[in-house]
Every structure is written in structure tokens, then in C-alpha cells.
Design a protein with these regions (language model features):
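Bacterial Sec-dependent N-terminal signal peptides
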Residues: 1-25
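Short, low-complexity N-terminal intrinsically disordered segments enriched in polar/charged residues
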Residues: 19-55, 60, 168-170
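Surface-exposed, charged secondary-structure patches
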Residues: 30, 68, 76-125
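Short beta-strand segments enriched in hydrophobic/aromatic residues
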Residues: 45, 62, 119-121, 152-153
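A short, polar/proline- and glycine-enriched secondary-structure boundary/capping micro-motif
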Residues: 79-81, 126-129, 157-165
Length: 170
């Protein structure tokens, strides 16, 4: 009987320590460095159809008023709020999708960082595709952590070879 009570108490404490974590405790490693926050940026959008979306983690990496700009194949820009983008994902069926970074260029001056990152979208983790995009991510460092302030994304198309051109650059 005592073993059952002790085991039950141990399980309750374990659940409380895991479920009771603050977002700072859960995701603090994601924002300690530029590499870590870019890894988290891709991780939150990658996973199998059975994996839950990581909206809390995604929100944690972005500053409160982050700007997201999506460019269509003609270069027309659409400004989207993070919450709106997340709601669109919530409303659609999750599919196996893995964003794989292909190349990155980073420029830093003080607490400001500009990241250029080419990536491809895969439907199986180890199988390459021709679905590729280029994203420009702006970060700042404040209060001991990195924040994503904005990002602009454009997908490669039959008429726009931006990823191919970016991959050729030294």
C-alpha cells in the first residue's frame, strides 16, 4: 500500500514539474543563440502528421509585434500576423512535412542580426524535393535572449530561381 501511495505521489510530482513549466523554462534553450533560434524556427514547422503543432514554442521565439511577409511568385507582398498564420495551420489537416535548411548567411552588428536562409520542404525526412524557398529573418538580442522581429519568405518557382542563385553564392 505504501509503495502505491509513494508511486502515485512521485507520478503527480513528475507531471507537475513537466506540465507546470513556464514557457521560459521549456524554451529558453531555443533563444540562447542565433543558431538555436533558427533551428527552433525550422523545428516548429517540421514533423509528421501525428505530431502536434508547436504554436507555443513558435510564439515564444517571436517578438510581440513580429512582422511576417509572404511574397508570391510575382513578388507581391502580403503582411500576415503570426496568430493568423497559426490559425490557418490549426484549421488545416497536418501532413508530414519537414523543413530542411540548405544554406545560411548571417550578418551581425551589435544586437541586430540578419539571416538569409535557403530551405526545402520534404515529405519524408531523408528525401529531397524541389520545393524550396528563401527566407530573410531579422533578429534582435534583448534581456538575455534572441527574438525574431520579422521574416520575409518567397518560394522558388519555374520563373524565379532565387534558391538556386543563393546556393551558388560564396
Amino acid at each position: 500500500m505504501n509503495k502505491i501511495i509513494l508511486t502515485s505521489i512521485s507520478i503527480i510530482f513528475a507531471c507537475n514539474s513537466i506540465l507546470g513549466q513556464t514557457t521560459d523554462e521549456k524554451y529558453s534553450e531555443d533563444v540562447k543563440s542565433v543558431d538555436a533560434i533558427i533551428k527552433a524556427y525550422y523545428d516548429v514547422n517540421s514533423g509528421s502528421s501525428s505530431d502536434p503543432w508547436e504554436f507555443e514554442r513558435d510564439t515564444y521565439t517571436h517578438s510581440k509585434n513580429a512582422h511576417i511577409i509572404l511574397l508570391d511568385e510575382n513578388g507581391k507582398a502580403e503582411l500576415v500576423k503570426l496568430e493568423v498564420l497559426q490559425n490557418e495551420f490549426r484549421m488545416s489537416e497536418r501532413k508530414d512535412s519537414y523543413e530542411k535548411e540548405l544554406k545560411r548567411k548571417v550578418s551581425q552588428f551589435g544586437n541586430i542580426v540578419q539571416v538569409w536562409s535557403a530551405y526545402e520542404i520534404r515529405y519524408e525526412p531523408e528525401t529531397s524535393t524541389n520545393i524550396r524557398g528563401l527566407v530573410s529573418i531579422q533578429l534582435h538580442y534583448e534581456k538575455g535572449r534572441w527574438w525574431i522581429d520579422s521574416w520575409t519568405n518567397q518560394m522558388e518557382s519555374d520563373t524565379n530561381f532565387l534558391v538556386s542563385d543563393f546556393l551558388k553564392e560564396k
